[in-house]
Protein backbone atom coordinates (compact mmCIF):
# COMPACT_ATOMS: atom_id res chain seq x y z
CA UNK A 1 0.00 0.00 0.00
CA UNK A 2 1.58 3.26 -1.06
CA UNK A 3 1.60 6.08 1.47
CA UNK A 4 -0.98 8.18 -0.37
CA UNK A 5 -3.25 5.16 -0.50
CA UNK A 6 -2.92 4.65 3.21
CA UNK A 7 -3.76 8.27 3.88
CA UNK A 8 -6.85 7.90 1.72
CA UNK A 9 -7.77 4.72 3.55
CA UNK A 10 -7.48 6.34 6.96
CA UNK A 11 -9.24 9.50 5.96
CA UNK A 12 -12.15 7.73 4.30
CA UNK A 13 -12.58 5.41 7.25
CA UNK A 14 -12.49 8.30 9.70
CA UNK A 15 -15.03 10.31 7.75
CA UNK A 16 -17.59 7.59 7.95
CA UNK A 17 -16.78 6.93 11.59
CA UNK A 18 -17.66 10.54 12.28
CA UNK A 19 -21.23 9.95 11.04
CA UNK A 20 -21.68 6.85 13.12
CA UNK A 21 -21.39 4.10 10.53
CA UNK A 22 -19.54 2.13 13.18
CA UNK A 23 -21.79 0.30 15.62
CA UNK A 24 -21.13 -0.80 19.17
CA UNK A 25 -22.67 -3.92 20.56
CA UNK A 26 -22.28 -5.71 23.87
CA UNK A 27 -20.75 -9.17 23.95
CA UNK A 28 -20.22 -11.90 26.46
CA UNK A 29 -16.46 -11.27 26.61
CA UNK A 30 -14.67 -8.18 27.85
CA UNK A 31 -15.03 -6.47 24.47
CA UNK A 32 -18.03 -4.20 23.92
CA UNK A 33 -17.45 -2.59 20.52
CA UNK A 34 -17.99 -4.07 17.04
CA UNK A 35 -16.60 -2.14 14.10
CA UNK A 36 -17.75 -3.04 10.59
CA UNK A 37 -17.35 -0.57 7.76
CA UNK A 38 -16.81 -0.86 4.01
CA UNK A 39 -16.83 1.73 1.26
CA UNK A 40 -18.95 -0.63 -0.85
CA UNK A 41 -16.22 -1.82 -3.19
CA UNK A 42 -15.88 -5.54 -3.84
CA UNK A 43 -17.17 -8.15 -1.42
CA UNK A 44 -16.68 -7.97 2.35
CA UNK A 45 -18.35 -10.64 4.46
CA UNK A 46 -17.87 -9.79 8.15
CA UNK A 47 -19.26 -11.88 11.00
CA UNK A 48 -19.65 -10.61 14.57
CA UNK A 49 -18.95 -13.87 16.40
CA UNK A 50 -19.54 -14.78 20.00
CA UNK A 51 -17.51 -13.15 22.73
CA UNK A 52 -14.53 -11.34 21.28
CA UNK A 53 -14.44 -13.27 18.00
CA UNK A 54 -14.91 -11.87 14.53
CA UNK A 55 -14.16 -13.05 11.03
CA UNK A 56 -14.00 -11.40 7.65
CA UNK A 57 -13.56 -12.68 4.12
CA UNK A 58 -12.96 -10.13 1.40
CA UNK A 59 -12.47 -10.09 -2.35
CA UNK A 60 -11.36 -7.30 -4.68
CA UNK A 61 -12.35 -4.67 -2.16
CA UNK A 62 -12.06 -0.97 -1.89
CA UNK A 63 -11.43 0.05 1.71
CA UNK A 64 -12.82 -1.74 4.77
CA UNK A 65 -12.22 -1.84 8.52
CA UNK A 66 -13.54 -4.65 10.71
CA UNK A 67 -12.63 -5.27 14.34
CA UNK A 68 -13.62 -5.81 17.92
CA UNK A 69 -12.59 -4.00 21.07
CA UNK A 70 -13.76 -1.38 23.51
CA UNK A 71 -15.99 1.67 23.30
CA UNK A 72 -13.54 3.58 25.50
CA UNK A 73 -9.82 3.10 24.97
CA UNK A 74 -7.20 3.03 27.69
CA UNK A 75 -3.44 3.67 27.80
CA UNK A 76 -3.13 0.90 30.39
CA UNK A 77 -4.97 -1.87 28.54
CA UNK A 78 -3.24 -5.13 27.72
CA UNK A 79 -4.82 -6.48 24.55
CA UNK A 80 -4.83 -10.22 24.02
CA UNK A 81 -5.78 -11.75 20.70
CA UNK A 82 -5.48 -14.85 18.57
CA UNK A 83 -5.48 -14.43 14.81
CA UNK A 84 -6.30 -18.01 13.91
CA UNK A 85 -6.57 -16.92 10.29
CA UNK A 86 -4.65 -13.98 8.86
CA UNK A 87 -4.28 -14.29 5.10
CA UNK A 88 -4.25 -10.97 3.21
CA UNK A 89 -3.54 -11.00 -0.50
CA UNK A 90 -2.59 -7.39 -1.10
CA UNK A 91 -2.84 -4.40 1.23
CA UNK A 92 -3.97 -5.08 4.79
CA UNK A 93 -3.08 -4.52 8.44
CA UNK A 94 -3.59 -6.58 11.58
CA UNK A 95 -3.47 -3.74 14.06
CA UNK A 96 -4.51 -2.24 17.34
CA UNK A 97 -6.30 0.93 16.30
CA UNK A 98 -7.98 3.86 18.01
CA UNK A 99 -8.40 7.57 18.59
CA UNK A 100 -8.01 10.13 21.35
CA UNK A 101 -9.23 13.70 21.61
CA UNK A 102 -7.65 16.73 23.34
CA UNK A 103 -5.56 16.52 21.27
CA UNK A 104 -6.99 14.57 18.34
CA UNK A 105 -4.67 11.62 17.70
CA UNK A 106 -5.14 8.51 15.56
CA UNK A 107 -2.91 5.61 16.65
CA UNK A 108 -1.81 2.21 15.38
CA UNK A 109 0.17 -0.72 16.75
CA UNK A 110 0.68 -2.85 13.65
CA UNK A 111 1.61 -6.50 14.23
CA UNK A 112 1.31 -7.76 10.65
CA UNK A 113 0.55 -6.51 7.17
CA UNK A 114 0.10 -7.65 3.59
CA UNK A 115 2.17 -6.14 0.77
CA UNK A 116 2.80 -2.71 2.29
CA UNK A 117 4.48 -1.92 5.61
CA UNK A 118 3.49 1.57 6.82
CA UNK A 119 6.12 4.21 7.55
CA UNK A 120 6.34 7.89 8.38
CA UNK A 121 8.72 10.24 10.16
CA UNK A 122 10.97 7.89 12.11
CA UNK A 123 11.26 8.54 15.86
CA UNK A 124 12.91 5.44 17.33
CA UNK A 125 12.07 1.94 18.47
CA UNK A 126 10.32 0.17 21.31
CA UNK A 127 10.72 -3.44 22.40
CA UNK A 128 7.51 -5.06 23.54
CA UNK A 129 5.95 -8.51 23.73
CA UNK A 130 8.82 -10.33 22.05
CA UNK A 131 9.35 -7.95 19.16
CA UNK A 132 10.83 -4.60 18.18
CA UNK A 133 8.60 -1.91 16.74
CA UNK A 134 9.61 1.15 14.75
CA UNK A 135 7.91 4.36 15.85
CA UNK A 136 6.63 6.85 13.28
CA UNK A 137 4.48 9.95 13.13
CA UNK A 138 2.50 11.36 10.25
CA UNK A 139 0.28 14.43 10.05
CA UNK A 140 -3.02 14.79 8.21
CA UNK A 141 -4.25 18.20 7.11
CA UNK A 142 -7.87 19.11 6.35
CA UNK A 143 -8.70 15.43 6.48
CA UNK A 144 -11.70 13.43 7.75
CA UNK A 145 -11.60 12.21 11.34
CA UNK A 146 -13.96 11.24 14.13
CA UNK A 147 -14.50 14.98 14.67
CA UNK A 148 -15.43 15.97 11.13
CA UNK A 149 -14.43 15.86 7.51
CA UNK A 150 -11.86 18.70 7.49
CA UNK A 151 -9.58 18.37 10.49
CA UNK A 152 -5.86 18.38 11.14
CA UNK A 153 -4.46 15.66 13.35
CA UNK A 154 -1.39 13.55 14.02
CA UNK A 155 -1.05 9.80 13.59
CA UNK A 156 1.14 7.74 15.92
CA UNK A 157 2.48 4.41 14.70
CA UNK A 158 4.30 1.46 16.22
CA UNK A 159 5.06 -1.00 13.41
CA UNK A 160 6.69 -4.33 14.15
CA UNK A 161 9.98 -4.72 12.32
CA UNK A 162 8.99 -8.21 11.19
CA UNK A 163 5.52 -9.65 10.81
CA UNK A 164 4.30 -11.25 14.00
CA UNK A 165 3.54 -14.97 13.66
CA UNK A 166 -0.17 -15.72 13.89
CA UNK A 167 -2.18 -18.76 14.94
CA UNK A 168 -1.43 -18.61 18.66
CA UNK A 169 -2.25 -16.27 21.55
CA UNK A 170 -0.55 -12.89 21.31
CA UNK A 171 -0.38 -9.84 23.57
CA UNK A 172 -0.03 -6.12 22.94
CA UNK A 173 1.06 -4.32 26.11
CA UNK A 174 -0.20 -0.95 25.00
CA UNK A 175 1.37 0.97 27.88
CA UNK A 176 4.82 0.08 26.50
CA UNK A 177 3.96 1.91 23.30
CA UNK A 178 2.31 4.82 25.10
CA UNK A 179 5.40 5.33 27.26
CA UNK A 180 7.76 5.04 24.29
CA UNK A 181 5.71 7.52 22.31
CA UNK A 182 5.71 9.89 25.28
CA UNK A 183 9.51 9.70 25.47
CA UNK A 184 9.59 11.09 21.93
CA UNK A 185 7.15 13.89 22.74
CA UNK A 186 4.22 11.98 21.27
CA UNK A 187 1.51 12.53 23.85
CA UNK A 188 -1.92 11.01 23.41
CA UNK A 189 -5.08 12.92 24.23
CA UNK A 190 -6.95 12.95 27.52
CA UNK A 191 -10.30 11.91 26.04
CA UNK A 192 -10.32 8.33 24.80
CA UNK A 193 -12.52 7.18 21.93
CA UNK A 194 -12.84 3.55 20.84
CA UNK A 195 -9.96 1.05 20.72
CA UNK A 196 -10.14 -2.11 18.57
CA UNK A 197 -8.05 -4.98 17.28
CA UNK A 198 -8.76 -4.54 13.60
CA UNK A 199 -8.41 -6.08 10.19
CA UNK A 200 -8.01 -3.24 7.71
CA UNK A 201 -7.72 -3.66 3.97
CA UNK A 202 -7.55 -1.69 0.75
CA UNK A 203 -7.80 -2.97 -2.84
CA UNK A 204 -7.11 -6.54 -1.77
CA UNK A 205 -8.55 -9.96 -1.04
CA UNK A 206 -8.11 -12.34 1.86
CA UNK A 207 -9.50 -13.65 5.10
CA UNK A 208 -9.04 -13.30 8.84
CA UNK A 209 -10.50 -14.80 11.98
CA UNK A 210 -9.54 -13.01 15.18
CA UNK A 211 -10.54 -13.40 18.82
CA UNK A 212 -9.89 -10.45 21.15
CA UNK A 213 -9.95 -10.31 24.94
UniProtKB/Swiss-Prot annotation:
InterPro entries, A to Z: ConA-like_dom_sf, GH11/12, GH11_AS_1, GH11_AS_2, GH11_dom, Glyco_hydro_11
A GO MF label: endo-1,4-beta-xylanase activity
Keyword Hydrolase annotated: yes
Domain of life according to the entry: Bacteria
Signal sequence range: 1-28
Active site: 106, 200
Entry keyword set: Carbohydrate metabolism, Glycosidase, Hydrolase, Polysaccharide degradation, Signal, Xylan degradation
PROSITE patterns per record: GH11_1, GH11_2, GH11_3
Residues covered by the GH11 domain: 29-213
GO biological process, one term: xylan catabolic process
Pathway: Glycan degradation; xylan degradation
Any Pfam family: Glyco_hydro_11
Catalytic activity, EC: 3.2.1.8
Record's catalysed reaction(s): Endohydrolysis of (1->4)-beta-D-xylosidic linkages in xylans
PANTHER family: ENDO-1,4-BETA-XYLANASE A-RELATED
Family membership noted in the UniProt record: Belongs to the glycosyl hydrolase 11 (cellulase G) family.
Name under which the protein is recorded: Endo-1,4-beta-xylanase A
Organism this protein belongs to: Bacillus subtilis (strain 168)
